[in-house]
């Protein structure tokens, strides 16, 4: 397998991965506010949107404490396909299916039984978030396993970043055309439930196909240098992170960047619809 094909395959995986992330981070809440809870009862809309937002916030905060355990589980994985590929592929499929369901009213529960909707929503979102996080950890951790050559790893990482940037930004361009193309009612440019479900299904398919291409087009290499000889507890991981001021500043800078990027993407779409 040529190095170029391996780089491109890996970039396809990160392309679909960040395409999917944009659907979660930006466009799911736009679906919730502009379509799912957009009735004539303003107080009900605001109440349900507030509850959905709270559920997502709680899950995202909990994710900070879950991710180290996910990473530890991946690190202990041993299969004939490698350590990372099974998580990339299974994470892509399960996250895609659950997100497509989330881009619906879950069988009408949003209207007929709001409390049951929130319960089912929370369960599905947790499943989606865990498997997406597992895929995220696996896909970005497998670079050292793709080559023993440091220069080749740097080139592969560059291809991966290019793929992820294109994937994340392409969503902004195609989201409304896809939603409107599949919508029976344009709804003033916001589309309807059918259009948003189609968008989620297509996005999930893109992420899954990208993961499959990555799985087929790359090869993991075992190395004794990458083997974890000791078990690391969550407390030890957290302690190291808190003492690493350079890493904390990088994390803070990325937090500011992420907030700015998502604010721009959200406000742009809300402005035009």
Model regions and ranges:
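Membrane-embedded alpha-helical bundles of multi-pass transporters/translocases
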Residues: 1-273
């Amino acid at each position: 397998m040529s190095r170029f094909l391996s780089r491109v395959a890996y970039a396809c995986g990160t392309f679909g991965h960040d395409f999917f992330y944009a659907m979660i981070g930006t466009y799911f809440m736009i679906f919730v506010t502009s379509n799912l809870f957009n009735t004539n009862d303003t107080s009900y809309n605001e109440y349900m949107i507030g509850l959905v937002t709270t559920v997502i916030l709680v899950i995202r905060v909990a994710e900070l404490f879950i991710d180290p355990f996910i990473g530890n589980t991946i690190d202990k994985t041993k299969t004939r396909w490698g350590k990372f590929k099974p998580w990339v592929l299974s994470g892509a499929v399960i996250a895609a299916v659950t997100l497509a369901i989330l881009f619906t009213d879950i069988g009408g529960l949003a209207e007929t039984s709001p409390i049951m909707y929130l319960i089912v929503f929370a369960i599905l979102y947790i499943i989606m978030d865990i498997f997406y996080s597992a895929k995220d950890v696996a896909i970005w951790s497998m670079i050292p396993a793709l080559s023993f050559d440091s220069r080749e790893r740097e080139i592969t990482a560059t291809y991966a970043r290019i793929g992820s940037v294109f994937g994340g930004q392409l969503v902004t361009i195609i989201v409304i055309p896809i939603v409107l193309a599949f919508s029976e009612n344009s709804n003033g440019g916001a589309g309807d439930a059918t259009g948003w479900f189609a968008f989620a299904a297509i996005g999930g398919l893109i992420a899954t196909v990208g993961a499959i291409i990555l799985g087929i087009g790359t090869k993991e290499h075992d190395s004794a240098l990458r083997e974890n000889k000791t078990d690391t507890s969550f407390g030890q991981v957290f302690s190291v992170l808190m003492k690493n001021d350079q890493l904390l500043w990088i994390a803070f800078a990325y937090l500011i960047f992420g907030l700015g990027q998502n604010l721009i993407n959200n406000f742009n779409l809300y402005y035009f619809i």
